[in-house]
Amino acid sequence: MHRGAANEHLPRTQFGTEIDPVGFRNTLRAIYGRYRLPLLITENGIGAFDKLEADGTINDQYRIDYLRAHIHQMQLAITDGVEILGYTPWSAIDLISTHQGCSKRYGLIYVNRDEFDLKDLRRIKKKSAYWYGEMIKRNGLTDAV
């Protein structure tokens, strides 16, 4: 069972979850220190109310900031000696939240639908999808990414 106290010094998502990249690094170090096995990080990301703009884009800079900060801390954990097998964001495509349905979005790719209307179900790359693709092409974070 996990218990904790809220940290008023940390920023929070639209849904009240703390954003703690340094805590992510500390957790990676603690798990690796205990088990001494390589780690595979899956579903690291942020849920938000993403909005399809009139020009057909989704500007999710908050997701880019979140991913950049967490990936940077993961790189520092690797420098600390933590073995990382791989990393995947949460998630490639929007999915249905068990609590907020279709309004809470997680993916790098937007699905054009809402709670009450399937609309055209188009898949639209968010700004974060382009950013993540560039990061992969460069094999990691750089000043440009």
Range-by-range predicted roles:
Residues 1-145:
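Non-catalytic scaffold segments within catalytic domains of secreted glycoside hydrolases
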